[in-house]
């Protein structure tokens, strides 16, 4: 029996993590091609997650790192179109709302069925680049797969037909379950000289938060206040964008 030919496209850390177990299942049951857009491919942002999660290397790298966001988006659409012409998949699977999801535009033009995981998320702020992407992708996908009832309602309110919306829940349940032993065996807490449940973990990397001097100053002020109030250390997981801004503005953090 001929296997369904599926292309999965990723481009960022969250997509790699959330799809890690889905990729394994597609490899097992489908004729599966894993594609990386290359929009920010480096060790810190991507390869470390392929290594840590034991995910196989992508079959195709599109190398879509453009000089601007518009350039990257244009390359994702154009280069994915070339890839679709060569691979001729029966279906495209994408997750989320980053620029890699815009490969759905070229898939739609080629009449390739599109399955969109994490559909229906909304922040109702069109200044956010991902809000634009998710609305485009939701409305051209053949099957939308929201995680929650709320996300499903947003899709219905925008006129999408209920028979093409399937609430799936988050794939992170399977991811956390599969890697639970590895997570428990990690020595990161002891290496950082922390006590279980006696610290905060924070990640700040969104463009609208980090690129604004005013906004990031407010975040640092709040983090320092929290640390002082609760007398607990705060671990800031720094995206390269955030690290660059912190260094440029020479922020001072609470010694805790």
Regions found by a protein language model. Give the residues of each.
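N-terminal subdomain of nucleotide-sugar transferases
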Residues: 1-39
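Residues at the starts of beta-strands that form the adenosine-phosphate
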Residues: 5, 31-33, 113, 164, ...
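Structural beta-sheet core signal
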Residues: 8, 34-36, 94, 116, ...
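Cofactor-binding loop segments of dinucleotide-utilizing enzymes, especially the Rossmann-like FAD-
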Residues: 11-12, 37-39, 119, 170, ...
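Donor-nucleotide binding loops and adjacent catalytic segments primarily
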Residues: 39, 47, 184-256
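A nucleotide-sugar donor-handling region in carbohydrate enzymes
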Residues: 40-44, 63, 140-215
């Amino acid at each position: 029996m001929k296997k369904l030919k599926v292309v999965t496209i990723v481009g960022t850390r969250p997509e790699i993590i959330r799809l890690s177990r889905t990729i394994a299942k597609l490899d097992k049951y489908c004729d599966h091609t894993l594609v990386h857009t290359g929009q920010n491919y480096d060790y810190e942002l991507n390869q470390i997650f392929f290594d840590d999660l034991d995910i196989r290397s992508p079959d195709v790298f599109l190398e879509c790192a453009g000089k601007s966001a518009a350039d990257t988006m244009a390359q994702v659409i154009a280069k994915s179109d070339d890839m679709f012409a060569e691979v001729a998949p029966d279906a495209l699977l994408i997750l989320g709302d980053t620029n890699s999801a815009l490969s759905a535009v070229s898939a739609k033009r080629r009449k390739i069925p599109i399955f969109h995981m994490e559909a229906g998320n909304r922040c109702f702020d069109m200044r956010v680049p991902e809000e634009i992407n998710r609305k485009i992708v939701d409305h051209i996908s053949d099957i939308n797969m929201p995680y929650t009832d709320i996300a499903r309602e947003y899709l219905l309110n925008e006129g999408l037909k209920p028979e093409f919306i399937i609430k799936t829940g988050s794939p992170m349940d399977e991811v956390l379950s599969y890697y639970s032993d590895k997570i428990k065996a990690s020595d990161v807490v002891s290496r950082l000289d922390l006590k279980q449940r006696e610290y905060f973990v924070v990640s700040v990397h969104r463009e609208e938060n980090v690129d604004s001097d005013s906004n990031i100053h407010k975040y640092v002020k709040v983090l320092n206040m929290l640390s002082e109030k609760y007398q607990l250390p705060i671990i800031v997981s720094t995206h390269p964008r955030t690290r660059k801004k912190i260094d440029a503005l020479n922020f001072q953090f609470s010694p805790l």
